[in-house]
Amino acid sequence: MAERISLRDYQRDLAARLKAADSGRTSSKLAVQAGAEGWLVDLMEAGEVIPVPPITAVAQTRPWFKGVSNVRGNLYSVIDFPAFLGGNGVALGEQSRLLLVAQRYRAGAALLVDGSLGLRNPDSWQPREPAQAPAAWLRAEYEDEAGRVWKELDVAELVRDANF
């Protein structure tokens, strides 16, 4: 049976959630798998996550640049994110996804990842110091309750990075 709450408690909770949403302080992040690493992306920085469409290879590019893909009439540069990070590239499969960078960055870029892991809220996780000197686009690093390390991506810094 559903738990009963008073109208006053319901209204107070609803008002708090609306206030948090209006102020942009919602903490849910999109979680993706990139190789062996878990990455978090702010929802305001992610355009959308889609199954991998056909990718047309481009010659004479870096190994992590997979090519270009047409998504609803828009061309996106497809970057194999785990390979960009220095690891093995994505083995394309049913779980593979393209994370489209938000339109406001005008980057026309999509990150190829091993899979989407849904939404996560890192508010209760322990912040940690990165094991090595972080890139400018590594916003933060966390450890969750299970001991898994999560890295938060700063998309604005990533698209400004000269290596990207």
Task: List PLM regions with ranges.
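An acidic, low-aromatic, low-complexity terminal/linker signal
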Residues: 1-164
